[in-house]
Regions:
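Active-site metal-binding loops of divalent metal-dependent hydrolases
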Residues: 73-75, 107, 190-192, 225-226, ...
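Structured beta-strand-rich core segments of catalytic domains in phosphoester-bond hydrolases
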Residues: 82, 101, 107-184, 276, ...
């Protein structure tokens, strides 16, 4: 297996793209003792008892909410502020957070610059989690994209490469349906355009409704590096259909970029609603394992059957 450390100083940490002004788009048993007992009760009496249950409004016990912890983390292809690629360091950040599910951005798969390592698979081994990888770009003999790690089984997943308003680095949305024991949820991750012009990010956002429509019966968590700050047009449009976990329960500014001296909040954990999700807390752990800081959020949620 390739070594875990690589010195990538002197190479471009990200794929460069052409900038330009982009028009902003518009907007399934055996009988139990109880059932045997009920079988000896005359039918008429059974009907009376059942009617009483109906009249009194008795219902089956509700499923208790699940405590669920998520993380989003742009790992900068495993490269820390020291210019070295160290997957053990990244894995430690993930493990220390004890997250149930993690959305990762800037993930290399078999590229030359990181020694041909399948980063998503290696991080899954180091953290003992299930994994899904979404490739958005062919790069240096391999692939580059996003990934999802999960302690819970991944029932299905799909990666959508987004349409672009101009030539540049392709972006995508990776969606995974998770079986959390008592039910299911959809966990998704993305990494949007990083250039100053907001047009490409807004064009990406216009595609989200269609991508999530087939999962409208599931509670949804949508994480990632959105490369835009609170108060931006992107954040305003996202807030029309999603709830920003930091705005709900975060303390302080929640800055995530750059990790040694963060001045911007561009990494987010969004939830689809406040009926199925009750945020408990959110945090930005300090680490120099990447140029971004991770965001961790814990919540109570009601899974879909």
């Amino acid at each position: 297996m390739a070594p875990a450390f690589f010195d990538t100083r002197g190479t471009s940490p990200r794929v460069r793209e052409r900038s330009g002004d982009i028009p902003v788009p518009e907007k399934e048993s055996k009988p139990t003792r109880l059932t045997k007992r009920w079988s000896r009760i005359p039918l008429g009496l059974s009907l009376i008892v059942l009617s009483l249950f109906a009249l009194t409004g008795c219902k089956p016990p509700k499923v208790s909410p699940i405590i669920f912890r998520v993380m989003t983390y742009n790992i900068h292809h495993g490269e820390g502020l020291d210019g070295k690629v160290d997957l053990d360091r990244i894995a430690k950040v993930i493990t220390n957070a004890n997250a149930d599910t993690v959305a990762l951005q800037e993930v290399d798969q078999n590229t030359k610059r990181t020694g041909g390592i399948d980063m998503a698979a290696e991080l899954a081994k180091r953290t003992n989690m299930h994994v899904a990888f979404g490739a958005n770009l062919d790069f240096q003999g391999g692939k580059y994209g996003t990934a999802i790690l999960s302690k819970h089984p991944i029932e299905s997943y799909e990666n959508h490469v987004l349409k672009q308003a101009r030539d540049g680095e392709p972006r995508g949305v990776l969606q995974a349906v998770l079986d959390v024991g008592q039910g299911r949820l959809l966990f998704a991750g993305t990494h949007l355009d990083h250039t100053r012009d907001q047009g490409e990010r807004l064009f990406s956002q216009t595609q989200f409704d269609e991508l999530f429509a087939k999962y409208e019966d599931l509670p949804i968590i949508f994480c990632g590096d959105f490369n835009d700050t609170p108060g931006s047009e992107l954040h305003k449009r996202m807030s029309e259909n999603w709830f920003d976990s930091w705005e709900l329960v975060g303390q302080g500014p929640g800055l995530t970029m750059t990790s040694d001296n963060p001045t911007r909040r561009i990494d987010y954990v969004w939830v689809s609603d406040k009926k199925n999700f009750k945020l408990r807390w959110t945090d930005v752990p300090k680490t120099d394992a990447s140029d971004h800081l991770p965001v961790v959020a814990e919540m109570e949620f009601k899974p879909a059957p």
